[in-house]
Amino acid sequence: TGRYAENVYFGKPSGLMDQMACAIGGMVYIDFENEEKPQVEKIDVDFEKAGLTLCIVDTKGSHAGLTHEYAQIPVEMKQIAAHFGKNVLREVEEKDFYAALPVLCKESGDRAVLRAIHFFAEDERVVKEVNALRAGDWNRFLKLVKESGDSSYKYLQNVYVSRDTVSEPVAIALAV
């Protein structure tokens, strides 16, 4: 339903993670191997007990102008996967991806390759984050979240519009 609303009503080619997390509530682990029936697991955490408060920061940033940028993420990941005869990047062996870097940069461009680098690292990082939460290791979890934000900024490149380098408030928020 969330994806349908995002795709059809709002005309945006996204809509899986945010809506799923909102519907379940709290921290969730989502595996999208089967997009029609993703595996969703609620991770019970107690921020208060850990002495933490979850805050949403108003960066004054906007998603305006980012629809095309977001839409290119799966397109570029699928371009990389297609090089290996696969439909999606999760079907590609990471070692094979790295062995083919020069060719992939020529075929799909550097941004697509950087986004794929993020994908491989993020898939591993998510498992580590979930394990840290289950173990109550908040320092490890927060370190991994910071790594994720840094990777999103540098490799996934989904925090700013590439043609508007004057206004990058989300990038500023990640930096501080």
Name each region found by the language model.
Residues 1-19:
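Glycine-rich, mobile lid/loop segments that gate access to catalytic sites or pores
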Residues 21, 26-176:
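C-terminal nucleotide
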